[in-house]
Amino acid sequence: MSTFKITNNPNSIIIDDHLKLGGPDASNTIDVNGVYMTHHLSSISGKDVVQPFKHNNKYYILIGEIYNCDNTLGSDIYFCIEKYLEHGDKFTEYLDGEFLFIIYDEKTNTIDLFTDPWSTRQAFYYKIDNYFYFSTYPMTEPKDGRFGPGGLTQSFELKFAVYNDTEWNNTFYRIPHNSHHNYNVKTGILKPVNTELHKWNLNQYKDNLDDLTNSFEEAVLKRHTENSTLFLSSGLDSSPIAMCLADHKKHFNSMTCLTGPWEGREDMETLNQVLQYTGTYNKNIKIENLPPDYDIFWDEKKSKSKWSNNRNRLVFANLAHILTGFMREKCISEFNSKVIFTGNGGDEIFDNYPSLPAGYPLKFNGNTNKNPSGFSIWPEDLSTVFPWQHFYGGQARRLLDLFETLSLAYGLENRNAFYDKKFAQEWLHVMPWIKNQTPKVLQKKYLRDRGIKVPS
């Protein structure tokens, strides 16, 4: 996934060691007239370009993956530069991926930052004294942390608190979703250029799930890479990903957690059916017990983890448990994997977090209690609710940033099939009478079409 830092401060700072964890394979820093640009590489394909990459008077950094890249160009960043030179600031419409793209123009002394529709790759701006910083991680955190407490057993008020792209004070800012921001190094002014790079079509006219299903499979397959690891549960988001990969004869690893906060939460009948269905292509391991010397609650002074304190501080200081860190350790030790496949986004984009049991339609009792501030019925006029609470902000922002922070601590890359521009657009196009049949209508149909029990 890689990490970056751009600053006018020539000295090392506290987050440098954190950034190196996210890009363990190579590091490069260049000085461009007092602007220091650093890129830490996590190599996935082995076909990597030293970044920042200079073309004419501009320096480019790409964080993330471009899935529609022209492979003859040799690297994703070349493709991005080509599209930028062809289309200017509208070039992101020609990119399909999970990315952050940065351009420093030494002639105008400006920095431009472009995010994908959900800003799946973090970028923070902050200013301390006379120094400015752009980086993957913030220099400081809000008092109570960015991620809140561990969510599985928390109340609605805590678990589904609204986490927005937000400016916490006058010197600290997270570069938001779907946007182009420009920073003038001389004046110190950061300004939005475009806060809606990608415009969604809210016309609900498709009376079947065919195009949506095809776009789901495309989203999964273009994110598949050799030796990737799926975090697999019996849930409605990761299970269809596993079956799609198996249907297309794609080999993958998977990991299922049955201990800690997940103990007793899986529908084992559904999980076993999915494992049987995907068995030829799926190398699965189950985490049923933690090693006796593994501390599930992190204490820096008492920590028995083999990982450095820098990693512990980065990942676990604001979390109630560290089991998700253990799962990432296993990705490396069991599979030597560098890419994590997740079902993240299935709730945020396709369900708006209703609380109804899987067997009930959205109209059951006319409301929900899991997200009382949200809507329970998809309306005829989608513009009345779009973008809904968790489409960009809320849990979408919280979980994207949380999972990226967790994975970068181990030099791993997340790939999120549900945060796909075409796939999300196809969902928006589906007529409301289909959306309102049942929560996660696509995922349930995908399981039932393959003879898999829908989890209760």
Set out the residue ranges of the language-model regions.
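Cysteine-centered catalytic environments shared across enzyme families
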Residues: 1-292, 299, 338
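ATP-dependent adenylate-handling active sites, centered on carboxylate activation for C-N bond formation
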Residues: 6-13, 108-112, 120, 128-129, ...
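Conserved PLP cofactor-binding pocket of PLP-dependent enzymes
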Residues: 456
